[in-house]
Amino acid sequence: MRVGCDIIAISRIEKIHSRHGKNFLDKFLNPKEQILIKNPATLAGLWAAKEAASKALGVGICELCSFFDIEISKDEKNAPKLKYSQKITKDFNITQTSLSISHDNGFAIAIVAVV
């Protein structure tokens, strides 16, 4: 099992989004993921989730794993769900993933476990 974690100030993501708008969103979220955004906290949570997912691979966001190799969605209970691209799943021999996102006191945090 491998674990990745990321924490970010919601205000930091909010400032970047207000400055760059949809261009910022398009750099790390696909259209289905953009629909999940309800407020700055959920946007920051999505950022943290993708960063944590890349760190769980031991590589971070880079040429080996782009933001678009990681997809965040919701399950039937509205809990966050993580899916890697087929290439990442094969290259890193991933059989299971688990994602948790939380927001509190101006921060968003995400933890990813990969088996």
UniProtKB/Swiss-Prot annotation:
Cofactor(s) required, per the database record: Mg(2+)
Keyword Iron-sulfur: no
Localization terms from the record: Cytoplasm
Main localization (coarse): cytoplasm
Gene Ontology molecular functions: holo-[acyl-carrier-protein] synthase activity; magnesium ion binding
Catalytic activity as recorded in UniProt: apo-[ACP] + CoA = holo-[ACP] + adenosine 3',5'-bisphosphate + H(+)
EC number from the UniProt entry: 2.7.8.7
Key word 4Fe-4S present: no
EC class (word): transferase
Protein's GO biological process: fatty acid biosynthetic process
A Pfam family that the UniProt record links to this protein: ACPS
InterPro entries according to UniProt: 4-PPantetheinyl_Trfase_dom, 4-PPantetheinyl_Trfase_dom_sf, ACPS, Ppantetheine-prot_Trfase_dom
Keywords assigned by UniProt, alphabetized: Cytoplasm, Fatty acid biosynthesis, Fatty acid metabolism, Lipid biosynthesis, Lipid metabolism, Magnesium, Metal-binding, Transferase
GO cellular component: cytoplasm
Residues bound to Mg(2+): 6, 51
Family: Belongs to the P-Pant transferase superfamily. AcpS family.
NCBIfam families: acpS (TIGR00516), pantethn_trn (TIGR00556)
Main function: Transfers the 4'-phosphopantetheine moiety from coenzyme A to a Ser of acyl-carrier-protein.
HAMAP family, per the entry: AcpS
Protein known as: Holo-[acyl-carrier-protein] synthase
Gene name of the record: acpS
